[in-house]
């Protein structure tokens, strides 16, 4: 069975590069009816935090990237790592090393001064050193000294590294804790991982890990190293370019569907297709079409995709996110139109759900403020008479008539004729009075969504405050 994994370290937030790796791994497993494993690599006890673990789990849940089976934590597997280390020592494939920090520092300085490759010189490799109680030591993996480590990377092609370039790396620290490169191999063997899709910053770790696989007589999985994501300027994507924490995108009003659709196309292609449902992603995804070159993050394209999903999604699919953003504003959504109806009207005018909530606030809050420029431009000496006539005409409508935007639009037109002015001389001041600004959806729709009571109350208030 095809089995992939996403294995983040909980030392910070879940960034978009990690999300893309998780997405590719998840899609490949789903495409092949396989399993997707989530593993928290928390062996860095000083830097790992529960807050970061929670951020990772929240991000994966928000995006809908559900793992199969339990979530694995490396800190709960220390006994297993120690067991394998002892097996390697017993088989002569690892050894105890008593070299002090001072000796290793002197060795490094000597190598640098003489333009030699830095790394451990193997002093304890064949010394058969057995640590005595109280002595400080580490355990090193006995890396092959000859030959070449080669693998066919699913993205980068054939890669070969001479074993002369690799030293005997530490697999157990002096405090007894196992190291990253060792733990991931044991985990991937025990979890039957067949395909490892990860960032290409791990390429240098791969030959070391392959040698451990071979020492443990295990099958070496397929590696697919995905290029990094760059900012729009070609530099490595960072905070200075904008949000990199995936949950910040939620706070900024982006839909998870838009994030996933954008990231799947960031370094992977399926013809000219731009818009993908989750089902379409799963069906089309493969490793062969991952681009070997870095991709630039285009914030404008992400915004375009987000607008598409706000406009085109079924309301049920985005309702949770819409309600989340309205809740953040403190607006009482029971004091206004149905959100489903509102989104259908406002979607064309916004790029994010933050914009949606902000630009729709006047539908739910009676505490509207008037835009000074709009008042100056549209409220004139004659506006009071127009408002009086509008109130008279609106009051004459029954509840059923108020549900028809065309009827309401015609009332505005009729009022313009009665006052012998153009439609704009009525519609624009009316907008200012009922929304606070000169911008809103079609005036008939705006009036319907606000409802008769709000419109009459706001017109009355505007008549008193703006038409003195």
Swiss-Prot record:
One of its GO terms (cellular component) is cytosol. It is found in: Cytoplasm. Its main location: cytoplasm. The keyword Magnesium does not apply. A motif ('KMSKS' region) lies at residues 236-240. ATP binds at residue 239. It comes from the Bacteria. Zn(2+) binds at residues 97, 99, 124, 126. A motif ('HIGH' region) lies at residues 8-18. One of its GO terms (biological process) is glutamyl-tRNA aminoacylation. Keywords: Aminoacyl-tRNA synthetase, ATP-binding, Cytoplasm, Ligase, Metal-binding, Nucleotide-binding, Protein biosynthesis, Zinc. InterPro entries: aa-tRNA-synth_I_cd-bd, aa-tRNA-synth_I_codon-bd_sub2, aa-tRNA-synth_I_CS, aa_tRNA-synth_I_cd-bd_sf, Glu-tRNA-ligase_bac/mito, Glu/Gln-tRNA-synth, Glu/Gln-tRNA-synth_Ib_cat-dom, GluQ/Sye. The keyword Ligase applies. Gene3D superfamilies: 1.10.10.350, HUPs (3.40.50.620). Its EC number is 6.1.1.17. It catalyses: tRNA(Glu) + L-glutamate + ATP = L-glutamyl-tRNA(Glu) + AMP + diphosphate. Binds 1 zinc ion per subunit. GO terms for molecular function: ATP binding; glutamate-tRNA ligase activity; tRNA binding; zinc ion binding. Its cofactor is Zn(2+). Belongs to the class-I aminoacyl-tRNA synthetase family. Glutamate--tRNA ligase type 1 subfamily. Catalyzes the attachment of glutamate to tRNA(Glu) in a two-step reaction: glutamate is first activated by ATP to form Glu-AMP and then transferred to the acceptor end of tRNA(Glu). Monomer. This is Glutamate--tRNA ligase. It comes from Francisella tularensis subsp. tularensis (strain WY96-3418). The gene is gltX.
